[in-house]
Amino acid sequence: MTDLRTEPLSTERNRPRLLYVTAEDWAFLSHRLPMARAARDAGFDVHVATRVQNGRAAIEAEGFTLHAIPFARGSLAPLATLMTLAALRRVNSDVAPDVTHHVALQSTILGLVATLGRRTVCVNAFIGLGYAFTSACAKARALRLAIGAVLRPLVDRDGSIALVQNAEDMAALISLGIPKRRIALIPGSGVDVNRFTPLPEQPPPLTFGFVGRLLDDKGVRTLVEAFRLLRGRGSDARLLIAGTPDPANPASVTEVEAQSWNKEPGITWLGHVGDVAGLWARAHVAVLPSRREGLPLSLMEAAACGRAMIASDVPGCREVVIHEQTGLRFPVDNAPALAAAMERLADAPDLRARYGAAARQLAEQKFASDLIGRQTVELYRRLLAAR
């Protein structure tokens, strides 16, 4: 396979410009940084358009050019939308990107509109089809129809492609009317297998870990309910919950509810955790009871750390948690089934070790950031060559 470090695309003077468009700077740093580094090392001039909070120094330290965009996540207010579109149009005009990589649904729709009439290749990353596809309520169904009507003409055009992380998300986009030829699949955003390395288990008590936003869609309430059932059977297990509420998401847990979990026996809500590898050093088993994922970074990081895993049997999670190989799967939203899976692994150190070793091997072979970076840069190159 091509060594990106030794075959840059062009000279410093005329490097192709790559613009990432994502709603939050922290999301770029947590999920897109490995592929952006791969693109930089392959010869791209990398720009990042995002809502700037605390990530400016880290992004600029990578040699990327940062552009502040007033994204308002969760808002469809006309004025806010127009302000975001205007800012994106200005950035597109100033940067004149050869490739624009939109991340998530809001950035994709607004970004594609902003690129109309521009000569740029568009990679539109769907990183797990969230609330509109996981909820059965009337509002979500209506939103799905609207999304399909808007996306079809925007994505189905020359130089534009939808990027998904699992086959089921590809099928969902096809069901919205997006042609298969306009869809590419790359499994996740990559995990640094040199930073996240196999860790020895800590002494008892047996500890379960959850890393993610505190959303119903992530199954955090199902996890708490299952843990209560487990403790009710006499288990001395512990549960570490790492993550914060997301007020812009209609499925978010409130901070008051999250604080209340700290008062329950065995549960510790940690809030935001910067050192995720350190958390997996404390936990024996990773748990993610999500309703749907693209490809969950928290499980990929746990796998790289050699941790056995438990996850709901849903798109995205299935790619990382292979039942009876890297962990256990259970029916979505089924707290008793989750409690049974937790109890099984709590009592089986040899099984945990076997699953953890297989998980590490899977992370190295399929999800390593170097591999994902190469695949992403190859996609950019292919689209540029066809332009």
State where each predicted segment sits.
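Donor nucleotide-sugar binding/catalytic pocket of nucleotide-sugar-dependent glycosyltransferases
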Residues: H67, G148-P198
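Conserved donor-binding/catalytic core segment of Leloir-type glycosyltransferases
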Residues: P200-K218, L223-R228, L240
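Short hydrophobic beta-strand element within catalytic cores of glycosyltransferases
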Residues: A308-A311, V321
